[in-house]
């Protein structure tokens, strides 16, 4: 599915780091990212270390890192790489980039801001405080961010303009409050979905479904992908008050897998656990898995 001539993420990151003027910073970033197998994530203590060592703010560091984040993009349709970095309440940085899939419908696409935010969500961040992106967020992403539990205070940084509130880009916004929904994306969930299993992949998918954000349809859905080396990556459904900017569970999981420096070609198994109240993501999930390499889907319906 990759569009890049430099296929491995390490090659793309090395090329991006070569463009950073501060060579010592570039070398430090190369070492840190290599040590963590090119996971697109910097814990708070690493962010603080870089800021202190190189006398910069975390906002300045995030702007420098945007080309590195964009290395994780798979722009197979647009040939246009977008990078984003979500800063969590913890102080950690979560990279994100656009993920596109040919030969299926364009609604399967993951935007860079969705990528960074869902990456943070899967790493159990509690709140997003800032997001840095190399291009102005599109309307789809503005609406997606409006679902966050930090929407009212979320700050957006662009190369040409920093410290703007989300609602500067989305005035008079329609959101969860219009539908009398108080629980937001990143708030804790308690769906109490239950299924007896000793299979760790099924349990991971069940846990992802129990974490899903679906206050409008009540279709709680989660997926787990197992790689050939037995690593497991979860994805939870992130629903949106405007419906169409919702992020399906498979996209969340694929994005998490890719942002951890892995390849979709290494997926061996997939399990979707779902309470299909008004919707179902089974068909859409099977369609995309077929494109990715005829990966069979185990589907488990719970209540």
Curated annotation (Swiss-Prot):
Give the record's GO biological process terms: cytidine deamination
For this record, the Gene Ontology CC terms, alphabetical, are: cytosol
Care to name a GO molecular-function term for this sequence? Answer: cytidine deaminase activity
What keywords appear on the UniProt entry? Hydrolase, Metal-binding, Zinc
SUPFAM superfamilies in UniProt: Cytidine deaminase-like
Q: Which residues bind substrate?
A: 98-100
Query: Mind telling me which InterPro entries this protein's record contains?
Result: APOBEC/CMP_deaminase_Zn-bd, CMP_dCMP_dom, Cyd/dCyd_deaminase_Zn-bd, Cyt/Deoxycyt_deaminase, Cyt_deam_dimer, Cytidine_deaminase-like, Cytidine_deaminase_bacteria
Give the first-level EC class, as a single word: hydrolase
Which family is this sequence assigned to?
Answer: Belongs to the cytidine and deoxycytidylate deaminase family.
Cross-referenced NCBIfam families: cyt_deam_dimer, PRK09027.1
Q: What is this protein called?
A: Cytidine deaminase
| Gene, per the UniProt record | cdd
